[in-house]
Amino acid sequence: MIIRKPNSGNVVAVCAPTGPHVEHDGLRAVAPSLTERQIMTRKTLADIADEMAGIDIAILSTHTDNGEIANRPMSNNGDVTYDGTSYYFTYEQTRAVADIQRNPKVALGFSSEGGIFSDGIYVAVEGTAELIRDKAAFQQHWTSDLDNWFEKGVDTPGIVLIKVKASRATYWKGREEGEVDL
């Protein structure tokens, strides 16, 4: 929806549509014209991977034991060559691990510099998480920056590698939005 100020036509907000029009406190939201709508496209994973290369932080969303959604920032630790699978290190005793053990369906949110109508990109990923406790796998995804968080490196007691395999990905970049072919 495009929300315009009465009698001026100035756009004051852009939001998800809720119907043909909504009025509140003198503002009227109307469905956008064809020129104001997002451009729906499909991109390949390689297209999106290039744009995601500089994004280190993702928001990992899990299902809690009471049915709520829990979110936390997770670092890619320099392992950002996106191929549909993401890896994150954490500790065994975290809520994220408990949530994934109960329900492996997760979501990831990525955002680069920029605003909604600038050159930044936003990517939402839905997928299935797997908990890996194998030291050989740790070594494949380990970077020296992780030593700041895990004092004994891959030998730190209680570390877990979270692997998220994407089943669906959506992106927004300026006026362009769409699904990613996985």
Predicted segments with their positions:
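A generic structural signal for short beta-strands and their flanking turns/coil linkers
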Residues: 56, 70-72, 82-84, 102-106, ...
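A short, Trp-centered hydrophobic/proline-enriched beta-strand micro-motif
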Residues: 50-66, 106-110
